A protein has these predicted regions:
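A short, Lys/Arg-enriched amphipathic alpha-helix followed by its capping loop at the start of a domain
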Residues: 18-28, 122-123, 169
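Conserved structural-core and active-site-/substrate-pathway-adjacent residues in large, well-folded domains
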Residues: 9, 20, 56, 113-116, ...
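Conserved beta-strand-loop-beta-strand element in the redox core of flavoprotein oxidoreductases
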Residues: 138-166, 170
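Conserved Rossmann-like nucleotide-cofactor binding loop
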Residues: 15, 38, 177
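Active-site-adjacent segment of FAD-dependent monooxygenases/related oxidoreductases
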Residues: 41-122, 129, 138-147
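Glycine-rich FAD pyrophosphate-binding loop
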Residues: 24-45
Length: 186
C-alpha cells in the first residue's frame, strides 16, 4: 500500500528534527524516518549558536534550553609555553556586542534534539519513525512543477518489509547513509 504525505524527511538528526518541528508548528504533517533504533542518546555537537537559540525562541522552547544549558560568556586561548606545557595567551568575549539578544550556550545534543522532538509532538502530535532504511527515491519530473502533486516516490524498508510513500516534497538530512540516487537531488 502506498501512503501519501506532504513532506517526507529522511533523517532525524538536528537538521531533520528542526525542519519537522517548523513544519509541525505551522500544522504541516510529515513522515520523518531514521535508520537508528531510537532517539540520539549521546551528543555529537553540543554548542548552540545565538541564532539557533533565536530559532528555539520562535518555537517557544528557548526558556527551557537556556535554563538547562551552560552559558558561554568568554573564550580563552592557550599557547605552548615552550617547555611542554601551555599558557593562557588571551581571553575575549564570546560574542560581539549587538549580535543577538540570545547567548551562545552548550547543552548535550541529545537533550537539544529531545527539546525539538517534544515541541514537534506538542505542535501536532508528530513523531519520528525509527528503524527505517530509505532504499530508493524517484521523482516524476512531469509532475514536479505541480505543487499539489505527489511527485516523489520514496521506497523504504523496516524490519524486512518494504513500504512506499508518495510525497510532494522530500528533505534529506542524512546523506551519509542515503541511497546513491538521493545525492542527485540534494
Amino acid at each position: 500500500m502506498v501512503q501519501n504525505v506532504d513532506v517526507f524527511i529522511c533523517g532525524s538528526g538536528s537538521a531533520g528534527i528542526c525542519a519537522a518541528t517548523w513544519l509541525a508548528r505551522y500544522g504541516i504533517t510529515c513522515k520523518i524516518v531514521d535508520s537508528r533504533s531510537g532517539p540520539l542518546k549521546v551528543g555529537q555537537a553540543d554548542g548552540v549558536q545565538c541564532r539557533t537559540v533565536e530559532v528555539f525562541d520562535s518555537f517557544g522552547i528557548a526558556e527551557e534550553l537556556l535554563r538547562e544549558s551552560y552559558h558561554v560568556l568568554e573564550v580563552t586561548f592557550w599557547s605552548s609555553d615552550g617547555k611542554g606545557g601551555i599558557i593562557r595567551s588571551s581571553r575575549a568575549p564570546d560574542r560581539e556586542n549587538g549580535l543577538s539578544h540570545q547567548p551562545h550556550v552548550i547543552l548535550n545534543q541529545a537533550r537539544i534534539n529531545a527539546l525539538l522532538l517534544d515541541a514537534m509532538k506538542r505542535f501536532n502530535g508528530q513523531e519520528v519513525d525509527y528503524g527505517y532504511t530509505v532504499k530508493d527515491v524517484q521523482v516524476d519530473s512531469a509532475k514536479a512543477s505541480d505543487p499539489e502533486a505527489y511527485c516523489v516516490t520514496v521506497t523504504t524498508e523496516k524490519d524486512g518489509t518494504e513500504e512506499v510513500f508518495k510525497a510532494k516534497y522530500v528533505l534529506v538530512s542524512a546523506i551519509q547513509n542515503a541511497p546513491r540516487n538521493i545525492s542527485h537531488f540534494v
